[in-house]
């Protein structure tokens, strides 16, 4: 159980084929949320219910080409929408500008529901403000932090502590 060594909330972003075969293992490992890709799941509602059966949060990941409207039928069952603002697979990619409109659409779909709106891909000091302004309340940043000389400073700036 990972909770024995970390108090940080953990989201397992399953960018894999057949995530249903791995949900139970991640739940047993002690993650707080499991996020699965919309595009990989024919039976998305069933998969979300499988995640929720472990009393953990469920998130849905949308790749750049996937429309926000596609998750409308399951919006009341999820705890997080993760907008991929790059094509998944490798770090260091440039932020896809059309993601801003997608974030705004997702924020509107969420309405007053208690759902996180996360964005992953190309998040750096040049993109974080516009992503937050569009409605995101959780940012995932890899390369901007890893490749920086002063990681703590970059993290603080991404958090808005300038």
What are these regions (language model features)?
Residues 34-42, 82-93, 134-154:
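Glycine-rich phosphate-binding active-site loops on the catalytic face of alpha/beta enzymes
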Residues 1-50:
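N-terminal active-site wall of soluble small-molecule enzyme domains
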Residues 10-14, 34-36, 58-62, 81-86, ...:
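Hydrophobic faces of well-ordered beta-strands that scaffold small-molecule active sites
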Residues 1-12, 50-59, 99-121, 157-162:
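Alpha-helix-loop-beta-strand connector modules within alpha/beta enzyme cores
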Residues 26, 81, 106, 120, ...:
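Conserved, mostly hydrophobic/aromatic
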Residues 20-28, 66-77, 123-139:
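Catalytic cores of alpha/beta
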Residues 64, 72-104, 108-111, 117, ...:
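Glycine/Thr-rich beta-alpha phosphate-binding loop at enzyme active sites
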Residues 23, 45-48, 68-71, 100-107, ...:
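Generic structural signal for well-ordered alpha-helices
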